[in-house]
Every structure is written in C-alpha cells, then in structure tokens.
Amino acid sequence: LMNKRAVVLYLSIILGLVLIVTGWYAASFLTYTSESVPEGFSGDRAYADVQTQVDMGPRTPGSAGHAQIREWMRTELESAGWIVEVHESERLGHPIYNIIAKRGEEPPQIILAAHYDTRFFADNDPDPAKHTEPVPGANDGASGVAVLLELARTLPADTTPTWLVFFDTEDNGRVEGWDWILGSRAFVEEVPIQPQAVVIIDMIGDAD
C-alpha cells in the first residue's frame, strides 16, 4: 500500500492548490497560507479511504468492485451534504459511469476530478509474473478518490461553485478493445459546462 506520510503531505499540498484556485474567484480565500489546513481535514481518514477501496478488490470496469465503489462513493458524498448524479455514456462498446457531486444547480466554476477505475493488467509491474494480474489501484485510482472524498467533507459550503467528478474507464489504454481516458472524454463531449479551472488529482501516493 502507498506511503502514509506521502498521503498526508500531498493532501495538504493539494488542498493548498484547491484553495488558491478557488481564491481567484472568492476573496475569502485570499488569506490562505500553505501552513493552514481547515479544521477537520484528516490525512489519516483519507488513508483509511484508500484502504477501504483496496479491500474491495480490483475496480476494473464491469467487476463487482467497480459497482461497489460507485455505491460507496455515493454514500460518502451524500453523507457530506453533496448532491450526487451519474453521467452515463458509452465508448467503444463499454458503459461509462462518471460520478458527479455538486452542492446546487449553479454551473461549476471549478472542477476537481480523479478517476476511480483500475487497470486490468499490471503490465508495468517490476515483477513479470504480475503482468497478467489486475492492478490493486492503491496509488493509481484510490489515492485521488480519497483526496476528493476528504475535500467533500471539508470544503466550505459557501465556496466558489465547485463540482467533484469521479471519472470512469480512464485507465485501460494499451488493452485490446479499450483506450485511455474514455470517461473524461465522454464527460467533456456530453456535459455542457465551461468551468474556469479544472484540477486533476491522480497518483499522489508515491513515496517520492
């Protein structure tokens, strides 16, 4: 599993980036400094969310873990007071379920996004024996989701209009019949919004 110290560090860095971005639109954030973290923001809780996802098993498209994580994310987001919608689409014959969390019907000025699916094959693993096994997805998948969920719990309700988007079917390029970033491409092509800023959170749990 990914390095816990790295998770806590990167959570703080990413939160700083988020508040700086939102500060372009909301004067209340102009006093933010890199040393300050909102009360209740927990790196330990985010790390636990990573473990929860890994315990579901691979979240490859169409798998039991893939369905389970969607329901779990919905529960966590709704518990934090967000409205949850599913953007359904299809690319290359594969169903897509992008999860959108928002606080109201106002179009977003900012989108914070991560992908939640995992890769069918660990073809970049240093151990060739694992190249045909699915990726556990602690770093590549779960870390970004954990950050967004913790932001969902701690972002102020009166912040700049923001959507949290959890992209599906992003991670299986170089697999026959698949391609990279299918979910985010479908979202961009089909959801008629024009945010001023987009922050993608991905693979933030490496030790380095």
Which positions does each model-derived feature cover?
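N-terminal Sec-pathway targeting helices
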Residues: 2-16
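Hydrophobic alpha-helical membrane-insertion segments, chiefly the h-region
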Residues: 12, 16-28
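N-terminal capping segment at the start of a domain
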Residues: 25-70, 206
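Second-shell loop/turn segments in exported
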Residues: 34-40, 54-65, 86-90, 131-142, ...
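Solvent-exposed loop/turn segments at secondary-structure junctions
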Residues: 60-61, 90-92, 105-107, 116-120, ...
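Active-site histidine-acidic residue metal-binding/catalytic motifs
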Residues: 114-146
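Acidic/histidine-rich catalytic neighborhood of metal-dependent amide-processing enzymes
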Residues: 133-208
